[in-house]
């Protein structure tokens, strides 16, 4: 099961630019929760706390239990507005999680790409997809998808059909797609080219 973050929030009844500025001066961040056919709920969060968690990896796929007026709501971050200079969180959109499954974007981590076989032979690891869209069980939402690519040779593609996803998750699209490739740098020889030239030299 995914790790669930516990956060406290307060309801807010005043809206508009002036009300938002007053909240921020008080060290709080305006936010809203919507979706799942529910009436949107306007809330505020402690600025330091939400900014701290936003700066951690994969916040946008973080499952959260929000406590508002002693009631708990299971939510996911949808969009985050930052201050253009300080990167402090200024506003957050959350979505209610009421369905058994949720469509969401998840970061992809390519483990060992610097040590991949094709890279060692002079190739370049080309990332095509940094995030993928999955349909996930809401109780098992992955923070990211980690793929070990250390054995990936030169001139190959990493395709979605070869990826083992966490239990309860599937790609939204059924069509096969490429996540990453290892391509030859200018002047670098692929393994096949090297073998062919060696064979010709031995004739």
Curated annotation (Swiss-Prot):
<dbReference type="InterPro" id="IPR020930">
    <property type="entry name" value="Ribosomal_uL5_bac-type"/>
</dbReference>
<dbReference type="InterPro" id="IPR029751">
    <property type="entry name" value="Ribosomal_L25_dom"/>
</dbReference>
<keyword id="KW-0694">RNA-binding</keyword>
<comment type="function">
    <text>This is one of the proteins that binds to the 5S RNA in the ribosome where it forms part of the central protuberance.</text>
</comment>
<keyword id="KW-0699">rRNA-binding</keyword>
<comment type="subunit">
    <text>Part of the 50S ribosomal subunit; part of the 5S rRNA/L5/L18/L25 subcomplex. Contacts the 5S rRNA. Binds to the 5S rRNA independently of L5 and L18.</text>
</comment>
<dbReference type="InterPro" id="IPR037121">
    <property type="entry name" value="Ribosomal_bL25_C"/>
</dbReference>
<dbReference type="InterPro" id="IPR020057">
    <property type="entry name" value="Ribosomal_bL25_b-dom"/>
</dbReference>
<protein>
    <recommendedName>
        <fullName>Large ribosomal subunit protein bL25</fullName>
    </recommendedName>
</protein>
<dbReference type="GO" id="GO:0003735">
    <property type="term" value="F:structural constituent of ribosome"/>
</dbReference>
<comment type="similarity">
    <text>Belongs to the bacterial ribosomal protein bL25 family. CTC subfamily.</text>
</comment>
<dbReference type="GO" id="GO:0022625">
    <property type="term" value="C:cytosolic large ribosomal subunit"/>
</dbReference>
<dbReference type="InterPro" id="IPR001021">
    <property type="entry name" value="Ribosomal_bL25_long"/>
</dbReference>
<dbReference type="GO" id="GO:0008097">
    <property type="term" value="F:5S rRNA binding"/>
</dbReference>
<dbReference type="InterPro" id="IPR020055">
    <property type="entry name" value="Ribosomal_bL25_short"/>
</dbReference>
<dbReference type="GO" id="GO:0006412">
    <property type="term" value="P:translation"/>
</dbReference>
<dbReference type="InterPro" id="IPR020056">
    <property type="entry name" value="Rbsml_bL25/Gln-tRNA_synth_N"/>
</dbReference>
<dbReference type="Pfam" id="PF14693">
    <property type="entry name" value="Ribosomal_TL5_C"/>
</dbReference>
<keyword id="KW-0687">Ribonucleoprotein</keyword>
<keyword id="KW-0689">Ribosomal protein</keyword>
<dbReference type="Pfam" id="PF01386">
    <property type="entry name" value="Ribosomal_L25p"/>
</dbReference>
<dbReference type="InterPro" id="IPR011035">
    <property type="entry name" value="Ribosomal_bL25/Gln-tRNA_synth"/>
</dbReference>
